[in-house]
Amino acid sequence: LQEKSCTDFQLAVDDYLIRHRSILDVLTKHQEAAARVNRAVAKAVTECGCISIVAERQKIPADAEFNNLKAFMSSHLSGELCENCRDVLINELGHSLFYLTALCNLTGLDLQAVLQHETKNVRTLGIFNLS
């Protein structure tokens, strides 16, 4: 997100988060929203079938070099989201982002600063970040 978009979104969330303003509400709503993201992906697989999951052990050649590992790693995802499933997933990701931003607001964190901090960490740590 660009800085102005982050700021605008954070201000909008602050303006419109009224009913579930308690930190406990925000934490549980964020968790619920994350579960709905997972469910949207699962439904795209099991009900629509526009995508499928073909999971197996990652096949990495013994002589593969560390800096080339990404080329051998699979997402286990096959196909592309149809328009309907894409819309559902975008909607659910939006709700998740809404409550993540609400959590930032209630704890006094700037969403843009969080994104910049994490971007710096990812770039600094490279492939060792969250691996």
Segments (PLM) and residue ranges:
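Flexible "arm" and connector segments at domain edges
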Residues: 1-93, 97-131
